């Protein structure tokens, strides 16, 4: 099995290195090939997603991704910015389903910004559609306003749109995920204002007829954002569009104590996927050896489970992470009084020892 390893920018190379060590420590042997992406791709090839990197990603059975982005690239034209690499990979590989688990480990309830009783035992899965919505809708751009109160003034515009096949396929993925968990699915929309999301809601209701054992509910996105803080454990699986999912998944991440703990998977129709931590490249701490590698290590576990059909090995990694937390090891982002603060490499070594 071939894994494309794309470390990227900022803390990406540091955290991916620890995940690779963990994969190498398993009984399985994987063919792993590394390629530049993001700012590293721009520096090497003049583009955030070089042709050879994309070719490797297409040929691989799965992709382990670090993070992209750095302030020094903010002046580049948008198509050349590091963040375009992840958008390009999603588009070219048709990665339409994003899984973002938000799990609060018992040892980390004190690190959450909410009261322990609100987050203890928290286990939410956010299923986000990745290929449609306002992020990719056309037309978009800057122009002279053709009408309205400020006709003739410069305006920026984007297009929110979803096709029926796009909504149906993500709805099926979400219902199937909910069927394997608590059999509760909440579809988050803004159907009271947006035609696109009334359309979304109607299709999700239609798909629900194929999953009678899953309880379907609907919630407007503003209320969902509030309920995630007020009563987060009332959710099991959430399905939503690209932009709403982008925002809500980061909000849910912070309920757990640190976004540095949370993995993610972006899958195609055949479960080939790109696996990455939910956090960004954090250029402010790059090279300092303090980044939390656990989200990336847990992303590698998700890769084993979903794309490589190695659930037993995924369990080993996840159990090792739980053991390390129980032993009191903490990186700076999750440290609490009485725990042992360690750096990136030390945390990786602790997971290896726990394996």
From Swiss-Prot:
Sample GO molecular function, one term: magnesium ion binding
Binding site for NAD(+): 280-292
UniProt keywords, alphabetically: Amino-acid biosynthesis, Branched-chain amino acid biosynthesis, Cytoplasm, Leucine biosynthesis, Magnesium, Manganese, Metal-binding, NAD, Oxidoreductase
InterPro entries for this protein: IsoCit/isopropylmalate_DH_CS (IPR019818), IsoPropMal-DH-like_dom (IPR024084), Isopropylmalate_DH (IPR004429)
Record-annotated site: Important for catalysis: 135, 190
Note accompanying the cofactor annotation: Binds 1 Mg(2+) or Mn(2+) ion per subunit.
Pfam family membership, one: Iso_dh
Cofactor(s) needed: Mg(2+); Mn(2+)
Pathway connected to this protein: Amino-acid biosynthesis; L-leucine biosynthesis; L-leucine from 3-methyl-2-oxobutanoate: step 3/4
Binding site for Mg(2+): 222, 246, 250
Reactions it catalyzes: (2R,3S)-3-isopropylmalate + NAD(+) = 4-methyl-2-oxopentanoate + CO2 + NADH
HAMAP family the UniProt entry points to: LeuB_type1
Function field: Catalyzes the oxidation of 3-carboxy-2-hydroxy-4-methylpentanoate (3-isopropylmalate) to 3-carboxy-4-methyl-2-oxopentanoate. The product decarboxylates to 4-methyl-2 oxopentanoate.
Family affiliation: Belongs to the isocitrate and isopropylmalate dehydrogenases family. LeuB type 1 subfamily.
Assembly notes: Homodimer.
Protein name, UniProt field: 3-isopropylmalate dehydrogenase
Lineage: Bacteria, Pseudomonadati, Pseudomonadota, Betaproteobacteria, Burkholderiales
């Amino acid at each position: 099995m071939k894994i494309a390893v794309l470390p990227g920018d900022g803390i990406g190379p540091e955290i991916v290195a620890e995940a690779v060590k963990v994969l190498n420590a398993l009984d399985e042997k994987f063919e792993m090939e590394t390629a530049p992406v993001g700012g590293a791709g721009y520096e090497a090839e003049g583009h955030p997603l070089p042709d050879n990197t994309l070719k490797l990603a297409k040929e691989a059975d799965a992709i382990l991704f670090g993070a992209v982005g750095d302030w020094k690239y903010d002046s580049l034209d948008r198509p050349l910015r590091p963040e375009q690499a992840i958008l390009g990979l999603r588009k070219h590989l048709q990665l339409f389903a994003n899984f973002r688990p938000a799990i609060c480990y018992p040892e980390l309830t004190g690190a959450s910004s909410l009261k322990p009783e609100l987050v203890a035992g928290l286990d939410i899965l956010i299923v986000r559609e990745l290929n449609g919505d306002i992020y990719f809708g056309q037309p978009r751009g800057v122009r002279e306003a053709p009408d309205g109160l400020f006709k003739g003034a410069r305006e920026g515009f984007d297009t929110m749109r979803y096709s029926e096949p796009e909504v149906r396929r993500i709805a099926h993925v979400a219902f199937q995920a909910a069927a394997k968990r608590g059999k509760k699915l909440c579809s988050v929309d803004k159907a009271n204002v947006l035609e696109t999301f009334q359309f979304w809601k109607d299709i999700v209701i239609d798909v629900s007829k194929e999953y009678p054992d899953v309880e379907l509910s609907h919630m407007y996105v503003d209320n969902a954002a509030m309920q995630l803080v007020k009563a987060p454990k009332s959710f099991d699986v959430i399905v939503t569009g690209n932009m709403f999912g982008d925002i809500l998944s980061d909000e849910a991440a912070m309920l757990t104590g640190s976004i540095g703990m949370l993995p993610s998977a972006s899958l195609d129709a055949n479960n080939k996927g790109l696996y990455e931590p939910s956090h960004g490249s954090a250029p402010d701490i790059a090279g300092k050896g303090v980044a939390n590698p656990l989200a990336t290590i847990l992303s590698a576990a998700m890769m084993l489970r979903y794309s490589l059909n190695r659930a037993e090995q995924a369990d080993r990694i996840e159990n090792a992470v739980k053991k390390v937390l129980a032993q009191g090891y903490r990186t700076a982002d999750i440290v609490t009084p009485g725990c042992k603060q360690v750096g990136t490499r030390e945390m990786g070594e602790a997971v290896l020892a726990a394996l």
